[in-house]
Design a protein with these regions (language model features):
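Post-transcriptional modification and biogenesis factors for structured RNAs
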Residues: 1-154
Length: 154
């Protein structure tokens, strides 16, 4: 299981997701360009000292990420407000990569159509979306539960 961040533009969210990945043993793919420098103090503060333990792969562009990903046997699972299936109804597999879009704009249509599945988190009427880090944590938790992928107790 991996978590991919498409051109993240809020350093605190990216840092929080990298901390989540480090703590749960889930690799993180950063698809650049980012809206901040990876040396940004807000990014480092959110990730704290967990960043040293995170499995982080940086990709210079969507095309480079997609090329690398296509060589794997995994599925690309997009979390989107325009999803066609609720995340809790989806059957996750250990080789899945969960993809979240930019906080400000989501992902372009070409990325949307490249995903093997497009999942949505149901919200109350009139609510647009959750924070990207919160949404990723919710769905990652369900994916790890389904695949028995949580790390063992220390």
């Amino acid at each position: 299981m991996r978590l991919a961040l498409y051109e993240p533009d809020i350093p605190q969210n990216a840092g929080s997701l990298m901390r989540l990945g480090a703590c749960l043993g889930v690799g993180i793919d950063i698809i650049e360009p980012c809206g901040f420098l990876l040396s940004d103090k807000n990014f480092r503060r959110a990730g704290m000292d967990y960043l040293k333990s995170a499995d982080i792969r940086r990709h210079a562009s969507w095309a480079r990420f997609h090329e690398d990903f296509s060589a794997s046997n995994g599925r690309l699972v997009l979390l989107t407000t325009r999803g066609d299936m609720t995340y809790s109804d989806f059957s996750f597999a250990a080789g899945d990569t969960l993809l979240v879009g930019r906080e400000s704009a989501g992902v372009p249509q070409t990325v949307h159509t490249s995903a093997h599945a497009r999942l949505v988190i149901p919200l109350r009427p009139g609510m647009r979306s959750l924070n990207v880090a919160q949404a990723a944590a919710m769905v990652l938790g369900e994916a790890l539960r389904q695949t028995a992928g949580f790390p063992g107790k220390a």
